[in-house]
Amino acid sequence: YETLKQVLGFHEELAKMEQLDFDPVRMEKAYNQERSEWQSLFSKEDKGMEEDKPCWIAPDLSEEQWQDMCLPGYWERNGLKNFDGVVWFRRSLEIPAEWIGKPLKLNLGMIDDEDITYFNGVEIARGAGYMTPRTYTIPAKLVKAGKAVLAVRVSDFGGEGGIHGKAEELY
């Protein structure tokens, strides 16, 4: 504690801890409350949500105005410098007839910080943790031949954000 007091950038957090008498239960509760408020603010700023419902997951949504981003990679290195918030990614793909009715494995590599992943407008998974690999299963009942759309809502709360890792980990 005494050492951290000497380091720039810790004063505000240490003052909060002092106010809570360094009680771990109270500190965790305060942290969770602060994080919840912050996430709520992010959601309000998210143009891909309308009345807390995702509007950019529809398979027939026009992508004409969307920009491309090279993945994997942090978005700060791909045109979104110093950005914390929500970014939506979409990818269209063709499902061959031999895959109909079979569960599919989806590997998104690592995502910083959180994601909600949709397949053809249906939420299939949520993940959290900036160094946690995301491997999901697309349920067999959703797998139909033809065009399919994968939409991923990525939230970043600080530092670098995005779908990152190794290219061979995305499949």
What kind of region is each of these model predictions?
Residues Y1-R77, Y130, L142-Y171:
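An acidic-aromatic loop/edge-strand motif
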Residues N82-D84, W99-I100, G129-M131, V143-A145:
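Surface-exposed coil/turn segments at beta-strand junctions on protein surfaces, enriched
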